[in-house]
């Protein structure tokens, strides 16, 4: 593969911003073609680091999906508003570029008129920058400590010692939990750092930031796990094509069950493609990880889950704490059963070294190993 060009990635992002900043015009689709061409080329390049290649490939497809939404499917300047801001198409070019940059960056829609009604923890508009700084520093330190503790497990000989699908149940659960904890807290560290930079620079306000992951106690169904507890960084770009397909192409009534299930299956299909592209970069094989199967079956199980819950409501069963507890057990059991092939291939491709920090506060305080030896892939 040819070497990766970060300049072309930056160019792709700039073109996406410009496509949202220019006033509505029929020729905007040309920018979409250029963005898709750039991203397709970059997907066939490599940095030499499999973990970085995986992340870059995923983000390239996210940019492509976002460009499809904002250029082809949505009249962004007329349909999307930030905090009731109106008339952006009449604003100056500089103001439209600022607006478009914030739109492209706002993957979760916080503060926009398309924000999902699921975010329960957010900063008050009255929160000072100093208070935000202190709270986010504590939050970031907590996330780092959890990653550090998971690193201790990743460095042990029992961690990820064999393919995940063939592991004894207890070690399979331990490996999945380690991956889940490390991944969620690592992503949270990155978003916390980004929030600090933007708020302290005056680019954004404390109220523009919410935790990247929802409450785990809300994940008592598979649907709620994906829709509330898991990150929502790709929610819009995965759902917009399905909404267009269901209402504009198939002519289904918005909000009807047929339309919603078309959107559900389309979103998980695109999620499968997104992750399969990353897996291909690592394994050079579209099928080894079973990525498409894993993500597409999530839609199937959610529809079955909806049916069971519908029957329960018809029987007069009320939602109580013990039913939620049973739901949590069901959700955990489902992922322990369904994710070993995909997750195992992902971990083996990236190596367990990707879940071992290069520096460790815990080991440093415990035995002076501030920079422990590198873990073998």
From Swiss-Prot:
Location of this chain's protein in the cell: Membrane
GO biological process: terpenoid biosynthetic process
Signal peptide: 1-27
Pathway: Secondary metabolite biosynthesis; terpenoid biosynthesis
Cysteine pairings via disulfide bonds: none
InterPro entries: Wax_synthase (IPR044851), Wax_synthase_dom (IPR032805)
Topology class, membrane: Multi-pass membrane protein
Keyword annotations of the record: Acyltransferase, Membrane, Signal, Transferase, Transmembrane, Transmembrane helix
Transmembrane segments: 29-49, 56-76, 176-196, 258-278
Keyword Signal set for record: yes
Any one Gene Ontology cellular component term annotated for this protein: membrane
EC number: 2.3.1.-
UniProt GO MF annotations: O-acyltransferase activity
Functional note: Acetyltransferase; part of the gene cluster that mediates the biosynthesis of pleuromutilin, a tricyclic diterpene showing antibacterial properties. The geranylgeranyl diphosphate (GGPP) synthase ple4 catalyzes the first step in pleuromutilin biosynthesis. GGPP is then substrate of the premutilin synthase (PS) ple3 to yield premutilin. Premutilin synthase is a bifunctional enzyme composed of the fusion of a class II diterpene cyclase (DTC) and a class I diterpene synthase (DTS), with the corresponding domains and active sites containing characteristic aspartate-rich motifs.
Family: Belongs to the wax synthase family.
PANTHER family linked: LONG-CHAIN-ALCOHOL O-FATTY-ACYLTRANSFERASE 3-RELATED (PTHR31595), OS04G0481900 PROTEIN (PTHR31595:SF57)
Name used for this protein in its record: Acetyltransferase ple2
Organism lineage: Eukaryota, Fungi, Dikarya, Basidiomycota, Agaricomycotina
């Amino acid at each position: 593969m040819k070497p990766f060009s970060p300049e072309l990635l930056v160019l792709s992002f700039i073109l996406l911003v410009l496509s949202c900043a220019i006033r509505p015009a029929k020729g905007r689709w040309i920018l979409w073609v250029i963005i898709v061409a750039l991203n397709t080329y970059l997907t066939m390049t490599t940095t030499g680091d499999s973990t970085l290649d995986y992340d870059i490939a995923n983000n390239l497809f996210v940019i492509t999906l976002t460009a499809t939404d904002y250029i082809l499917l949505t009249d962004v300047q007329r349909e999307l508003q930030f905090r009731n801001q109106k008339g952006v198409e009449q604003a100056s070019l500089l103001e439209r570029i600022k607006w478009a940059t914030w739109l492209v960056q706002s993957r979760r829609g916080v503060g926009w008129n398309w924000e999902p009604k699921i975010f329960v923890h957010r900063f008050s508009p009255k929160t000072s920058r100093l208070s935000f700084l202190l709270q986010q520093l504590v939050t970031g330190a907590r996330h780092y400590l959890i990653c550090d503790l998971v690193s201790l497990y990743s460095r042990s000989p029992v961690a990820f010692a064999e393919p995940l699908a063939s592991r004894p149940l207890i070690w399979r659960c331990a490996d999945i939990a380690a991956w889940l904890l490390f991944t969620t807290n690592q992503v949270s560290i990155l978003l916390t750092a980004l929030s600090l930079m933007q708020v302290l620079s005056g680019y954004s306000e404390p109220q523009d930031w919410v935790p990247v992951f929802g409450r785990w106690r809300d994940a008592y169904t598979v649907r709620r796990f994906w829709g509330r507890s898991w990150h929502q960084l790709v929610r819009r770009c995965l759902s917009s094509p399905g909404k267009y397909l269901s209402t504009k192409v198939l002519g289904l009534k918005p909000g009807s069950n047929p339309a919603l299930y078309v959107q559900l299956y389309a979103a998980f299909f695109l999620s499968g493609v997104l992750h399969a592209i990353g897996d291909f970069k690592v394994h050079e094989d579209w099928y080894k990880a079973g990525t498409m199967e894993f993500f597409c079956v999530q839609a199937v199980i959610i529809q079955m889950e909806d049916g069971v819950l519908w029957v329960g409501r018809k029987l007069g069963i009320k939602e109580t704490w013990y039913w939620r507890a049973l739901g949590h057990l069901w959700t955990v059991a489902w992922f322990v059963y369904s994710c070993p092939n995909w997750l195992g291939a992902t971990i083996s491709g990236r190596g367990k070294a990707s879940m071992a920090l290069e520096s460790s506060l815990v080991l440093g305080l415990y035995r002076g190993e501030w920079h422990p030896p590198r873990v073998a892939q």
